[in-house]
């Protein structure tokens, strides 16, 4: 059984507008049989934090193209993307690079 994981989840670049304008969220993910990874975190975010228009944040089980994901200030592509196993006190930042004109 994986222990609960405490994280700071942040949204920027306009992505925070989908989360009632709140940029920083301190979250504790409950214990579950498998370790928490980014894939499961995204499902949790969709169910618990996302307030409107999920299609602007997610596509399938991942984030939409144009949303940069940083884990502890490193690009998630260097960390294993959806398969990265979350550690207690990780900081996960989602930044939208999509802007209207």
UniProtKB/Swiss-Prot annotation:
Task: Tell me the Gene Ontology biological-process terms attached to this UniProt entry.
Answer: protein urmylation; tRNA thio-modification; tRNA wobble uridine modification
Q: Which Gene Ontology MF annotations are present?
A: protein tag activity
* Compartments, as annotated in UniProt: Cytoplasm
On modification after translation, the UniProt record reads: C-terminal thiocarboxylation occurs in 2 steps, it is first acyl-adenylated (-COAMP) via the hesA/moeB/thiF part of the MOCS3 homolog, then thiocarboxylated (-COSH) via the rhodanese domain of the MOCS3 homolog.
Protein function = Acts as a sulfur carrier required for 2-thiolation of mcm(5)S(2)U at tRNA wobble positions of cytosolic tRNA(Lys), tRNA(Glu) and tRNA(Gln). Serves as sulfur donor in tRNA 2-thiolation reaction by being thiocarboxylated (-COSH) at its C-terminus by MOCS3. The sulfur is then transferred to tRNA to form 2-thiolation of mcm(5)S(2)U. Also acts as a ubiquitin-like protein (UBL) that is covalently conjugated via an isopeptide bond to lysine residues of target proteins.
In which family does this protein belong, per the annotation? Answer: Belongs to the URM1 family.
The protein, known as: Ubiquitin-related modifier 1
User: Which organism's genome codes for this protein?
Assistant: Gallus gallus (Chicken)
Instruction: Print the organism lineage.
Output: Eukaryota, Metazoa, Chordata, Craniata, Vertebrata
Gene behind the chain: URM1
């Amino acid at each position: 059984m994986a222990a609960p994981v405490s994280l700071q989840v942040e949204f920027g670049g306009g992505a925070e507008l989908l989360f009632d304008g709140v940029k920083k969220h301190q979250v504790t993910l409950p214990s579950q049989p498998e370790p928490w990874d980014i894939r499961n975190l995204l499902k949790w975010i969709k169910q618990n934090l996302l307030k409107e228009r999920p299609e602007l944040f997610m596509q399938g089980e991942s984030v939409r193209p144009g949303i940069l994901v940083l884990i502890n200030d490193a690009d998630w592509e260097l960390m294993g993307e959806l398969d990265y196993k979350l550690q207690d006190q990780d900081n996960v930042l989602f930044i939208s690079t999509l802007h209207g004109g």
